[in-house]
Amino acid sequence: AQTVRXDIPHHEXYAAGG
């Protein structure tokens, strides 16, 4: 989710910490 932010925008928030 960290390296695929663009690929997975749904987990982007979760990976970022909220």
From Swiss-Prot:
The keyword Secreted applies. It comes from the Eukaryota. One of its GO terms (cellular component) is extracellular region. Keywords: Neurotoxin, Secreted, Toxin. Its main location: secreted. It is found in: Secreted. GO terms for molecular function: toxin activity. The keyword rRNA-binding does not apply. Expressed by the venom gland. Belongs to the scolopendra toxin 5 family. This is Scolopendra 5924.74 Da toxin. It comes from Scolopendra viridicornis nigra (Brazilian giant centipede). The lineage of its organism: Eukaryota, Metazoa, Ecdysozoa, Arthropoda, Myriapoda.
